[in-house]
């Protein structure tokens, strides 16, 4: 019987823990599942590179994965911020790429899958991640971090201060 008491106590503790985790998870942030509702006008990567040839702007590439919870939170809370969306829509070519994708793109003058660009060319290993790309297609810098709307807005303004220097790359 003492073994049965231990098992029963363990089951009760496990059940209590499961209920606590479940209750906490249900109070988490609302996550946007449909990217079509985003305020940011996301472009195809190839189209952004083509457009940048005739109308030079920096290309802001957001890398995400379907399994990345912080990426979904960024979609819901940061990219749906009217100020952030306005800056991205008017001052940059905004691109969203699935880091797990096997689609081919040209990154830093090399044709690779998005996944290979993520790991090998841009040397990223965490999500969410951002790559700033010059109009000629060369990456300028990478950032791996989740941010608030205010932090991203500040970072975008910092990019714009260096835009003239970076556009020629």
Regions found by a protein language model. Give the residues of each.
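Thioredoxin-like thiol-disulfide oxidoreductase module
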Residues: 49, 82-160
